[in-house]
Regions:
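Generic structural signal for well-ordered alpha-helices
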Residues: 105-110, 156
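Histidine-centered active-site loop/cap adjacent to the catalytic His
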Residues: 63, 187-213
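Short acidic/His/Gly/Ser-rich catalytic and metal-binding motifs that mark active-site loops
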Residues: 88-90, 130-135, 178-184
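Conserved SGNH/GDSL esterase-like catalytic core that processes O-acyl groups on lipids
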Residues: 2-103, 107
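A short helix->loop->beta-strand "cap" motif at the edges of active sites that frequently abuts
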Residues: 116-120
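Short glycine/proline- and charge-enriched loop/turn segments
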Residues: 45-49, 135-145, 183-190
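Substrate-gating cap/lid alpha-helix
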Residues: 131-172
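Alpha-helix N-cap and loop-to-helix initiation/capping positions
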Residues: 96-101, 140-151, 191, 195
Length: 213
């Protein structure tokens, strides 16, 4: 874990000391950290407390290593998890990246249920990516080359099956995000992966019923 991640993790540890237990938690990687969930929810009339414990660049190994400050310590009544896209890489996993990712997702759910048996767990589908934006560079394309519609669909099918097997909820918020090639719409993203707030507003519309339930 690099220095910036360590700093964010330490801040979360301090915040967890004063956090109210039993509230709603959003946690995961950058796609969760960058989700302005608290502002959007409040502007839509949601009054409950929502915590965000996302950390940019986090993979599932790191999440498991630090699952207490990122999830368990808050003892949430509901947790929305979006983690795993940073495992979609040939380094260090090679052609075993998919098996590694799905095995760790299972571990995350199992560890959460073992410690927090009454917490409602919502596993979120990976968002679409776009590898065909005109401003992308060879470096950025190489970084995200495995995030094809086919690979993302494969991951999301696996996430849904894992959630069902473990008695959790699976949420796919992607209907309003994709173009006719099943890629992220260009107006939603600045690098092909990370989202502008206009995309997160659509994500919120899809998950709001689960947030209010």
């Amino acid at each position: 874990m690099d220095e910036l991640k360590e700093i964010k993790l330490k801040n979360y540890q301090y915040l967890n000391e004063v956090a109210i237990k039993g509230e709603t938690l959003f946690t995961g990687s950058s796609l969760m950290e960058l989700f302005p969930i608290c502002e959007i929810a409040r502007s839509r009339g949601v009054d409950g407390i929502i915590y965000n414990r996302g950390i940019s660049g986090l993979n599932t190994d790191e999440f498991l290593q630090h699952i207490h400050p990122l999830l368990l310590d808050l003892q949430p009544s509901k947790v929305f998890i979006n983690i795993g896209t940073n495992d979609m890489t040939e380094e260090p996993y090679g052609d075993q990246w998919f098996q590694h990712l799905t095995a760790n997702i299972r571990r995350i759910l199992e560890q959460t249920q073992a410690v927090l048996p009454h917490t409602k767990i919502y596993l979120m589908a990976f968002y679409p990516a776009n590898l065909h934006l005109p401003w992308q560079t060879p470096v950025s394309i190489q970084w995200m080359k495995l995030r094809t519609p086919e690979n993302l669909d494969r991951c999301n099918q696996a996430l849904e099956e894992i959630a069902q097997t473990h008695g959790c909820h699976f949420i796919n918020c992607n209907d309003g995000l994709v173009n006719d090639r099943k890629e992220q719409k260009a107006e939603h993203t600045y690098d092909g992966v990370h989202l502008y707030a206009n995309a997160y507003l659509k994500v919120f519309e899809a998950l709001e019923p689960y947030l209010l339930n």
